[in-house]
């Protein structure tokens, strides 16, 4: 009589190793998504400073011009050229550029001028919930219970930051118009996230970022040229121009690459929860850079957001599908 391991048991180490690689890749996607939204959150603060002396269309046009040049150089150095695109890919990239670049940038930068930062934060905090709902209706993605709980936690956390923090009672003329612009920006961000799931899987994150930046530049170009023709270039300081450079290299090149690196590896409902990092990042940086009040309720709100992300990405321990039983053979 002798014993030998069953076929399943002998392959178990390889199966576990493959599972570990998948988990590591997914965790890498989570880190990329969170980092991307933290950078985009900084754009709210930097954008408020930038548009004080440089018009929205001109600054945005310059931003995407610089970003496109950098991304094109990286794409040709690393991938040696453009990937093959289908008509569907081109359409999706154009829609993404219009909604998540052109529409989002214009509505956000103009919106914060007409409404309070508090109300802007309240509205942008609904992005994760909107993405989760749209992913269910448009992409037919099932919303798991833990994802729904995570979305609600994140939304509650960011709304707590904005509703009960300092300045929540401030009013601004034309606030309704500003709020409508912020809502349009939120819709653009949600569609931007969802459309990424429709691209061909062979297109790299770098290539997608390059195309989106190029198309975004083309959308802004005619309006940027119009503003450039009458702009007084002696008004902005070196610091003002550095805001444009930051927007180009970090908010566009780096954040786009990180976002596309992660968004194609997880469900839309899960990637949507990470957009809650955006307003949290904006609140923290507003306190550090703009010296706006940072209160205890902000810590509570941030804890809710982190808790929501944790609930969403945590994995249940799976039972061992390959028990340690051995087979006996003669």
Swiss-Prot record:
Keyword DNA repair in annotation: no
Keywords: Cell membrane, Membrane, Repeat, Transmembrane, Transmembrane helix, Transport
Species, as recorded: Bacillus subtilis (strain 168)
Protein name: Uncharacterized transporter YetK
GO cellular component, one term: plasma membrane
Superkingdom classification of source: Bacteria
Gene (UniProt): yetK
Recorded family membership: Belongs to the EamA transporter family.
Principal location listed in the UniProt entry: membrane
Protein location: Cell membrane
Membrane-topology annotation of the record: Multi-pass membrane protein
Domain EamA: 38-163, 187-314
Keyword Transmembrane: yes
Transmembrane segments: 27-47, 56-76, 90-110, 119-139, 147-167, 176-196, 206-226, 243-263, 270-290, 294-314
InterPro entries: Diverse_Substrate_Transporter, EamA_dom
Disulphide bridges, residue numbers: none
């Amino acid at each position: 009589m002798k014993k030998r391991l069953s076929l399943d048991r002998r392959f178990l180490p390889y199966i576990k190793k493959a599972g570990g690689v998948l988990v590591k890749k997914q965790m890498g996607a989570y880190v990329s998504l969170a980092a991307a939204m933290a950078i985009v959150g900084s754009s709210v603060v930097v954008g408020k400073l930038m548009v004080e002396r440089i018009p929205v269309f001109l600054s945005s046009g310059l931003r995407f011009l610089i970003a496109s040049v950098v991304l094109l150089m990286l794409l040709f150095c690393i991938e040696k050229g453009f990937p093959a695109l289908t008509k569907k890919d081109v359409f999706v990239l154009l829609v993404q550029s219009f909604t998540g670049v052109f529409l989002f940038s214009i509505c956000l930068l103009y919106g914060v001028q007409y409404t309070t930062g508090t109300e802007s934060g309240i509205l942008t905090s609904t992005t994760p919930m909107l993405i989760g709902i749209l992913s269910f209706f448009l992409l037919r993605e099932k919303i798991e219970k833990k994802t729904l709980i995570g979305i609600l936690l994140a939304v509650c956390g960011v709304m707590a930051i904005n509703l009960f923090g300092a300045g929540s009672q401030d009013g601004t003329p034309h606030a309704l118009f500003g709020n409508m612009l912020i809502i349009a920006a939120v819709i653009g961000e949600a569609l931007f996230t969802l459309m990424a799931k429709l691209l061909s899987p062979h297109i790299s994150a770098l290539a997608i970022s390059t195309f989106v930046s190029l198309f975004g530049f083309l959308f802004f170009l005619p309006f940027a040229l119009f503003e450039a023709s009458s702009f007084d270039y002696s008004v902005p300081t070196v610091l003002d121009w550095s805001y444009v450079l930051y927007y180009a290299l970090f908010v566009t090149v780096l954040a786009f690459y990180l976002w596309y690196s992660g968004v194609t590896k997880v469900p839309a409902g899960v990637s949507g929860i990470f957009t809650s990092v955006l307003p949290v990042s904006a609140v923290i940086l507003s306190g550090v850079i703009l010296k706006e009040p940072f209160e205890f309720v902000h810590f509570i709100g941030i804890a809710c957001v982190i808790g929501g992300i944790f609930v969403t990405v945590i994995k249940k321990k799976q039972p061992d599908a390959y028990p340690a039983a051995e087979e006996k053979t003669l």
